[in-house]
Amino acid sequence: MPQNEYIELHRKRYGYRLDYHEKKRKKEGREAHERSKKAKKMIGLKAKLYHKQRHAEKIQMKKTIKMHEKRNTKQKDDEKTPQGAVPAYLLDREGQSRAKVLSNMIKQKRKEKAGKWESPLPKVRAQGETELLKVIRTGKRKKKAWRRMVTKVCFVGDGFTRKPPKYEKFIRPMGLRFKKAHVTHPELKATFCLPILGVKKNPSSPLYTTLGVITKGTVIEVNVSELGLVTQGGKVIWGKYAQVTNNPENDGCINAVLLV
């Protein structure tokens, strides 16, 4: 055995440390975070080369994943497809691939879902970050500009606890926090003042959804228990989605249409 392979020799004689495999697993888990940190801190030409290398690695990984996925799908083989009459026991081998059938099924389900939740406002203007988040300057010389204040109406749940003001990035003013919405039932043609349960989706950005920002076109969840709606099984419906149809920051109230 070569002289420099003393670690391998020791392992052959006495085995691994008891915590070796655990430490190795943890180190591999940390590696992605460490590489990310390294990439963020690098500057100049070294950073360019490192980013290029990481980019190539990611492309290679995606190609490998794609190849593995391709291996599991059955593709149509035109040469083997028999011509003319085919006996019943060979029908399942004919032309159509399993992947294509699955893809068509998924597309069909998506279409059904889209029809089920057809919204009153299919298209709305996207809200930019500049008009929705105001930069708040902090520090002794007002040089720090990492804090943002939400300038639109938002919903904050009852269980929400603020972070310490020193570390709070997004400020949601109390005057812009709304708890109720005027929801119109399209079939009953009646409007109800219902409590908001949460913000399902803000079309402008996922960040606004997590912040609970309510703008025109936002889908919110409202408490419809007092409407007395029931399912086919006879259970009372608790929450239902509604789409906001006005600009709440201008009108001072939230008007929405129930999605039925």
From Swiss-Prot:
The residues forming a coiled coil are none
Q: Which GO terms describe its cellular component?
A: nucleolus; preribosome, large subunit precursor
Where this protein primarily resides, as one coarse class? nucleus
User: Residues involved in crosslink (Glycyl lysine isopeptide (Lys-Gly) (interchain with G-Cter in SUMO2))?
Assistant: K80
Q: Which UniProt keywords apply?
A: Isopeptide bond, Nucleus, Phosphoprotein, Ribonucleoprotein, Ribosome biogenesis, rRNA processing, Ubl conjugation
Q: Does the entry feature the keyword Signal, yes or no?
A: no
**Segments of skewed composition (Basic and acidic residues):** 20-34
Q: Where is this motif: Nuclear localization signal?
A: 11-18
Modification sites for Phosphothreonine: T81
Q: Which residues form the signal peptide?
A: none
For region Disordered, the annotated ranges are: 20-42
InterPro entries named in the record = NSA2_fam (IPR039411), Ribosomal_Se8/biogenesis_NSA2 (IPR022309)
Where in or outside the cell it occurs: the entry states: Nucleus, Nucleolus
Q: A Gene Ontology biological process annotation?
A: maturation of 5.8S rRNA
Q: What does this protein do?
A: Involved in the biogenesis of the 60S ribosomal subunit. May play a part in the quality control of pre-60S particles.
What protein family does this chain belong to? Belongs to the eukaryotic ribosomal protein eS8 family. Ribosome biogenesis protein NSA2 subfamily.
Subunit description? Component of the pre-66S ribosomal particle.
- Tell me what this protein is called: Ribosome biogenesis protein NSA2 homolog
- Gene of this entry: Nsa2
